Amino acid sequence: GKAEAIRRLRKGSANKVPFQPLPTTSPRKDSPLRILGVGEIRHPALIGYLRERGIDPAVAGALCREVHYAIGERRFFAIGFRNDAGGWELRNSQFKGSSTPKSITTFDRHGDTTLLFEGFFDLLSYLTLQHEPTPTADTAVLNSVMNLPRALPFLARHATIHAFLDNDEAGRLTLERL
């Protein structure tokens, strides 16, 4: 643990700490991710993860589910956010991934203004700050900036787009493409 690492650093033997790679949890071509079950978010680890991220669990519970999945023979669980094609965006403290098919998620309230988010945790953060359990305005979640072309028909129907994208190169390029 931490105390052992400090002790070894003080003794000058830190280079003798054995390297133990973390097991990979990302899907491989020979072991695709399979959804095993979906239900209400109940696991204490997932509720704790939401709280660590500053997300109101009631907000997450309105839009997300607890998804149990397998990669090969190993079983896992995560917070799942469903996309318009029936796939899931999956997050927990150890994993960020998705099931197929990969797509955007939209909430159509038939307005002339839309909100655009890069990822679903961005949407959950926004809703937590607004004290709203679900979007009241038209909303699109890209679930990846690579999905922008899929969102363009939905976005084009709106006179105003409020974009909540990451302040990085991918977010800036996405904004330029709008």
Give the positions of each predicted feature.
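Eukaryote-skewed repeat-based solenoidal scaffolds used as protein-protein interaction platforms
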Residues: 39-40, 44, 48, 61-73
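Acidic beta-strand-to-loop metal/phosphate-binding motif
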Residues: 116, 158-170
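Non-catalytic accessory segments of DNA primases and related replication-initiation nucleases
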Residues: 1-49, 169, 173
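Short, surface-exposed acidic
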Residues: 2-9, 54-66
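Acidic, metal-coordinating catalytic cores used for nucleic-acid/nucleotide bond scission
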Residues: 144-148, 165-175
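Phosphate-handling DNA/RNA-contact segment within nucleic-acid enzymes
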Residues: 69-157
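Short, aromatic/basic amphipathic alpha-helical patches
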Residues: 153-154, 172-178
